[in-house]
């Protein structure tokens, strides 16, 4: 399912377990999302861009194929509040991972907005990469009032 946003289209895929993928895309990456969960995700994304600050925690994610470490990281990042940031190093210390491992896992995260990887920055305030699109990360952090 395509979700239009101010940043461009997002592609959504769902499985019986939850959201399988939500990410910026120029072309479909898999089967079309349908059903109640797809509609809930669409409504939550629309609410986010309307400034309503949903936390997305009520949306189940399908972590099939992910390592236990990556699952723990994604679940922890889901708890970073709207308008706040946390550092790669702080997450790494908390979860027993290196900051580079945190960054690599977040770059590969298929759950755009639902796992708010854009809220993870360097301890010195530099943004760091974000799916290869630092400008997108900057836009989201400004939109949320974190910068």
From Swiss-Prot:
Gene null: resulting phenotype: Disruption increases the spontaneous mutation rate.
GO molecular function: DNA binding; methylated-DNA-[protein]-cysteine S-methyltransferase activity
Site (Required for phosphate rotation/nucleotide flipping): 88
Swiss-Prot/TrEMBL site (Arg finger, required for nucleotide flipping) positions: 100
GO annotation, biological process: DNA repair
Family from the record: Belongs to the MGMT family. ATL subfamily.
Complex and partners: Interacts with several proteins, including UvrA, UvrD and the three subunits of the RNA polymerase.
Function: Involved in DNA damage recognition. Binds DNA containing O(6)-methylguanine and larger O(6)-alkylguanine adducts. Binds to the damaged base and flips the base out of the DNA duplex into an extrahelical conformation, which allows processing by repair proteins. Also affects the regulation of gene expression in response to alkylation.
Protein's UniProt name: DNA base-flipping protein
Lineage: Bacteria, Thermotogati, Deinococcota, Deinococci, Thermales
